[in-house]
A protein has these predicted regions:
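Bacterial N-terminal signal peptides that target proteins for export
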Residues: 2-12
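Generic low-polarity alpha-helical segments
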Residues: 1, 19-21, 256
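Bacterial N-terminal signal peptides
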Residues: 11-22
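Active-site-adjacent core segments of small-molecule enzymes
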Residues: 27-335
């Protein structure tokens, strides 16, 4: 299992990740990280110096205060009760830097938590409660199916239809997006950790958990009429304007798993009656366009974890680290 423990300064850690780009997945994987990154480049074209996925984004900074009550489940310093600096990035999936903010696709929030001693904790989240693939192969096939037809400049509807028919694990997220319009602002959405993680406490007891961040500004959705009339770029400026009037906050809610809950499949939800507790508050106090801002050069690898939090064997979660490293290495080199 490939897990990064981050007791290194952020600048040095990022440099080491660039060297990790050649990492490949275990032999049993159907596709490699290189193939996925190449597929993203083929479908969305190469934008030098930019992320291959979640290319369009906005930076924000602030702090996180975790609740010591979480120490029942984890020894992580993330929940010390002391303010910790954070860098966040909001983004839209895909490699198109000009994707319209009205697109009915997921919204992402990635956060780097800076813990005492130089260690880091990353969380990469979406505003959908499930992911769109149970395996790297499905994720790869989805990217390939979305490649624009040269004659139309748009994805081939027949290829999209065939993909959905042959990949039922892609349907739960697609159905959620079809039923729920996008939020009018980054601050009006909950963000889900998608994957299941292991919390390890001081006695080395392991608890399976999932988490989500719930906005204090409330969850809202745009109407169909608002989607039709909205400009293609409004999310960034709305966030910048919002934080000028005061900080924005999300409560971190932890869901406690029970025996039998799916641990390795991010397309499956847990039962709604699982125990849930508040374990912290994320506060963002400023925001800026990503060019030259705090989040631009960060690699929000979800396997960057501080002591007390560990990954499960979710194949999608484990696949993300080498894919992120390859993309990050290309960005550092200006490609």
């Amino acid at each position: 299992m490939f897990v990064i423990k981050s007791n290194l300064p952020a600048w040095l850690f990022s440099g080491l990740l660039a060297l990790a780009a050649p990492l490949c997945m275990a032999a049993e994987e159907e596709v490699t990280a290189d193939q996925v990154v190449s597929a993203l480049e083929s479908t969305f074209e190469v934008h030098p110096g930019e992320r291959r996925n979640h290319t369009k984004g906005t930076c924000a900074v602030g702090e996180f205060v975790g609740s010591p009550e979480a120490h029942v489940y984890t020894r992580s310093a993330l929940f010390s009760g002391k303010p910790l600096p954070v860098v966040a990035r909001f983004s839209l999936p895909g490699g198109n830097p000009k994707v319209p903010d009205t697109a009915k696709i997921p919204r992402g929030m990635a956060v780097e938590f800076r813990l005492p001693g130089g260690s880091l904790q990353h969380m990469t989240m979406l505003n959908t409660p499930v992911f769109g693939a149970a395996s790297p192969q499905t994720f790869f096939d989805d990217i390939v199916a979305k490649k624009p037809d040269p004659s139309t400049g748009k994805p081939d509807p027949e290829k999209i239809k065939a993909f959905k028919a042959s990949h039922p694990d892609s349907l739960p997220q697609a159905e959620f997006l079809a039923k729920n319009n996008p939020p009018p602002s980054w601050v009006n959405s909950s963000y889900f950790g998608i994957h299941t993680f292991k919390f390890v406490n001081a006695k080395n007891k392991i608890t399976l958990v999932r988490w989500r961040f719930v906005p204090e500004d409330g969850e809202k959705q745009m109407t169909d009429a608002e989607l039709k009339s909205a400009q293609p770029d409004f999310l960034e400026q709305k966030l910048i304007d919002r934080v000028k009037h005061g900080p924005v906050r999300w409560d971190m809610m932890l869901t406690i798993g029970e025996p039998g809950d799916p641990a390795d499949n991010p397309t499956l939800m847990w039962p709604a009656n699982r125990k849930e507790i508040k374990v912290g508050t994320l506060t963002l106090s400023s925001a800026a366009p990503q060019k030259g801002a705090a989040c631009e050069k960060l690699n929000f690898d979800p396997l960057v974890m501080a002591d007390g939090i560990e990954p499960t064997n979710d194949p999608v979660l484990l696949f993300r680290s080498p894919a992120y490293a390859i993309s990050f290495g290309k960005r550092l080199s200006g490609n």
